[in-house]
Amino acid sequence: MLIYNQKFSVSPITTHIPLKNVYKKLNQKTIINNALTINRFYKNKLKKKPKIAIIGLNPHCETKTKLNEELKIIIPALKKLKKRNINVYGPFAADTFFLKNNLSHYNSIIGMYHDQVLTPFKTIFGFDASNITLGLPFLRLSVDHGPNVPMLGKNKSDTKSLENIFKFINSIE
């Protein structure tokens, strides 16, 4: 899952699982595959080599303790990605990463769980984005929000995300 806006995109490593299960699903392979897939998408579809920021799992993740996921999983994954010439940076603390002065330096931001990156992203852009499913042999785009059943038939839905899908498709073809 890549939530894309022209300014930057976000991608959670884990998606729709309870927060208490996130650390159990994290591993180097998943982080590496996510970053490689984003890198390939940016190079093939957007014709640029992205700068990818990785957000840590724990508060103040820059403080390295013996038992944290950053030291065991995230930092080794970053090192392996750098050896493959992928522009990755981090891990960054989630609570301050989405400040304006940080965002202009990166094309894509990988977080460890859904709300870690989607909450600040939607606070900044609202529904001015598209949901892109990466890793498929074809391009799959969707609106960046769920079905919003309570609004069905009320003519109140924001169409910005759907409009962005068409703009995006026209911009790359």
Per-range role (PLM):
Residues M1-E173:
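Anion-binding alpha/beta catalytic cores of soluble intermediary-metabolism enzymes, centered on
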